[in-house]
Design a protein with these regions (language model features):
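Short, charged, amphipathic alpha-helices and their helix-cap/turn boundaries
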Residues: 1-13
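Domain-terminus/edge residues, biased toward the C-terminal soluble/receptor-binding domains
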Residues: 10, 24-27, 31-190
């Protein structure tokens, strides 16, 4: 499990058990929780399951009538669309509570083909739904997708060392200048 965290880029998390319940050396940051959620919600089957508002449990010998379980994530599930907690763009998520972490809320939302994940840790009862909704509204209002090439004239290449016939350069030493002709490669040392 911790290997998967590393693969996802999580740097401030460690799990001791698969349940997520308290452990002496178990912790997760909000950022890492968002990375985990983003990877989870790339799985369409998981999105379908976790976005279900109810699920009917079949009858058993212990419970001959069966029963229905309902989702508790108020941004995703509501009987009242005017509820201050409901957010129609919220597709799925998870609620939780631990003594150390308090009320926790992870929400996955999609609007105009943009996907956002909000994470609330140490939230207050019911208020964490309001806070999660506010984070998503802020994100969709404040951030846009755009093609850098349409707006910028210089690009930094990344974090890897680049080997060229003139030597090795750190990415921060190079930039791409799209105004250069193709024959000049557009790379130059900054």
């Amino acid at each position: 499990m911790n290997e998967k965290l590393a693969e996802l880029g999580c740097q401030e998390s460690h799990f001791e058990n698969p349940s997520g319940l308290n452990g002496d050396n178990q912790y997760v940051s909000a950022y890492d929780m968002a990375l985990i959620a983003q990877a989870a919600y790339d799985n369409e089957t998981l999105v379908e399951i976790s976005s279900a508002t109810t699920h009917r449990i079949a009858p058993t010998t212990q419970n001959p009538d069966g029963f229905t379980i309902r989702g508790e994530h108020r941004l995703c599930v509501t009987e009242d669309p005017s509820s201050p907690y409901y957010y129609p763009e919220a597709i799925a998520g998870k609620t939780g509570y631990l003594i150390k972490a308090g009320n926790t809320l992870v929400t996955y939302a999609v609007k105009d083909n943009r996907r956002l994940v909000s994470v609330i840790l140490k939230g207050q009862p019911r208020q964490y739904f309001v806070d999660g909704k506010a984070l998503l509204e802020f994100g969709f209002r404040s951030f846009q997708h755009y093609t850098v090439a349409d707006y910028e004239s210089r690009y930094v290449t990344g974090n890897e060392t680049i080997n060229l016939d003139k030597g090795s350069f750190q990415a921060s030493d190079l930039m791409i200048d799209p105004d250069k002709s193709e024959g000049q490669a557009g790379l130059r040392k900054t």
